[in-house]
Amino acid sequence: MEEFDSEDFSTSEEDEDYVPSGGEYSEDDVNELVKEDEVDGEEQTQKTKGKKRKAQSIPARKRKQGLSLEEEEEDANEESGGSSSEEEDAAAEQEKGIGAEDARKKKEDELWASFLNDVGPKSKVPPSTQVKREEETEETGSSKLLVKAEELEKPKETEKVKITKVFDFAGEEVRVTKEVDATSKEAKSFFKQNEKEKPQTNVPAALPSLPAGSGLKRSSGMSNLLGKIGAKKQKMSTLEKSKLDWESFKEEEGIGEELAIHNRGKEGYIERKAFLDRVDHRQFEIERDLRLSKMKP
């Protein structure tokens, strides 16, 4: 069976390749074959011409199988016009959809705002007034803080009191006047001395009312009072007198501030001396601490 099938398959292929001899063709068959050959040649020539025209980019008529393609071009133009109109319609529909979405969002916002107005508590004071009040409170608080800081920075002005002291310098009476704070020790001591001297000055006025038999006692009492008054005068040394004269000269000439500024400078003798004193004192404290630390068990 297999040999038979293979033989049949070979015979079928031979049948396809089989070409009859010329004597077997009729005249009709020959004419049909000639026509088919002519049609095939025309189609090939038309294809080559179409390719050349496409390469030259000439918008001419395309022919295929001997027929013009104008109808196909018109159909393509109609299709392109239809596609453009479809695109325009789609864009218009999109715009309409966007507008509808915007309108829907606006409606939703309005509904939400009305819901909040109905449900939420109504604020009696508008936000602008609240902001203004907050700013005013902040300004008042800052101004109060500034005032308190200024009050702390400014020391309380103390009252000044003029004190007059009497000194004895080489048998001469020297009076010194100073301006001192009312709460200072000098002012308090000066007031105490004045209070003590007032009753002593009133004693001589009461002496004439004493009886005449006490004349010796009267003279002794007067001498004692005068001696006490004279003994109260403090003696002034030469250094104190020179210092007093220098202070009075500075006040008369008005050079006290200039001298103070000069002495505070880097080249001032007083400033240098004070610096050296501070250094010595600090060195002494360090050495003392070291000694104490070594002495401890």
Swiss-Prot record:
Compositionally biased residues, Acidic residues: 1-18, 25-43, 69-78
Keyword line: Centromere, Chromosome, Developmental protein, Isopeptide bond, Kinetochore, Methylation, Phosphoprotein, Ubl conjugation
Compositionally biased residues, Basic residues: 48-65
Region (Hydrophilic): 176-215
Region annotation Disordered: where it falls in the sequence: 1-154, 190-221
GO cellular component, one term: Swr1 complex
Pfam families assigned: BCNT
UniProt KW Cytoplasm keyword: no
Intracellular or extracellular location(s): Chromosome, Centromere, Kinetochore
Biased composition (Basic and acidic residues): 93-110, 190-199
UniProt entry tagged with the keyword Nucleotide-binding: no
Sites of N6-methyllysine modification: K217
Per UniProt, location of the Glycyl lysine isopeptide (Lys-Gly) (interchain with G-Cter in SUMO2) cross-link in this chain: K148
Phosphoserine PTM positions: S80, S83, S84, S114, S214, S248
PROSITE patterns in the record: BCNT_C
Coarse class of the protein's main subcellular location: nucleus
Domain BCNT-C: 216-297
Biological role: May play a role during embryogenesis.
PANTHER family found in the cross-reference section: CRANIOFACIAL DEVELOPMENT PROTEIN 1 (PTHR48407:SF1)
Protein name according to UniProt: Craniofacial development protein 1
Organism: Camelus dromedarius (Dromedary)
